[in-house]
Amino acid sequence: MINEIINKLKEFAQQNFPVPEVSSYLLDLNLNENELKFYSFHEENFYTRNLIHKDSDFELMVICWPPNTTAPIHGHEGEKCWARVQEGQLEICNYEEISSEPL
């Protein structure tokens, strides 16, 4: 299944990752939790970024967050980014960038 996901994302890369299509694909994706366990490494006090695939077009990873963990405010510098919650809950807060100047 992981190879199928990577191949589908490579197809989307050829189309510059059309947002509605990629979003729909990820929402409808029936992931096998046993396959994800191979990529799911947890830490008690901070989140982990577990890389599955990386090439010049995209990165695919499993991010494991313990409860009540936060990440610093950050940007993706114009990149398209999707997150899918496989288990549990995730709260995301998007901010509007008012200035690119340092504080």
Residue ranges and their predicted role:
Residues F38-P67:
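A short glycine-rich, His/Asp/Glu-containing loop-to-beta-strand
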